């Protein structure tokens, strides 16, 4: 074996893998038009959502408040940070005092973020109109 380059005999697994990836991707792109759903005619029954045999009442398109998505994003962010805290708890003995100080800073940032979100009203589910009505009632 020469030190000038990689011998060609060592590259065959990589080339085979590349060719197989191309075949799989090509197959995945080529087959859907042949295997997919074909709609030849549209009827009112095919346009309705399937409700397990129950006649649909009203629209199947529900409108959710943007606040719902905002709360969901906050939940995902804080849940992910909880995973980091669990990982720190597993390595608690190995990290020592520096790790303890770092997790205190991390939790402090979490608490500061939560207080900030609470103060600006991002966690408040009420609309501005509901808040103003409540403020006039409590005066």
From Swiss-Prot:
Xref: Gene3D superfamilies: NADH:ubiquinone/plastoquinone oxidoreductase, chain 3 (1.20.58.1610)
Class of enzymatic activity (EC top level): translocase
Keyword Metal-binding assigned: no
Listed transmembrane segments: 11-31, 70-90, 97-117
Catalytic activity field: a quinone + NADH + 5 H(+)(in) = a quinol + NAD(+) + 4 H(+)(out)
GO MF term (any one): NADH dehydrogenase (ubiquinone) activity
Matches recorded under InterPro entries: NAD(P)H_OxRDtase_bac/plastid, NADH_UbQ/plastoQ_OxRdtase_su3, NDAH_ubi_oxred_su3_sf
Pfam family, one: Oxidored_q4
Entry superkingdom: Bacteria
GO CC terms, sorted: NADH dehydrogenase complex; plasma membrane
Job of this protein: NDH-1 shuttles electrons from NADH, via FMN and iron-sulfur (Fe-S) centers, to quinones in the respiratory chain. The immediate electron acceptor for the enzyme in this species is believed to be ubiquinone. Couples the redox reaction to proton translocation (for every two electrons transferred, four hydrogen ions are translocated across the cytoplasmic membrane), and thus conserves the redox energy in a proton gradient.
Subunit structure: NDH-1 is composed of 14 different subunits. Subunits NuoA, H, J, K, L, M, N constitute the membrane sector of the complex.
UniProt family annotation: Belongs to the complex I subunit 3 family.
PANTHER family in the record: NADH-QUINONE OXIDOREDUCTASE SUBUNIT A (PTHR11058:SF21), NADH-UBIQUINONE OXIDOREDUCTASE CHAIN 3 (PTHR11058)
Protein name: NADH-quinone oxidoreductase subunit A
Source organism (scientific name): Methylococcus capsulatus (strain ATCC 33009 / NCIMB 11132 / Bath)
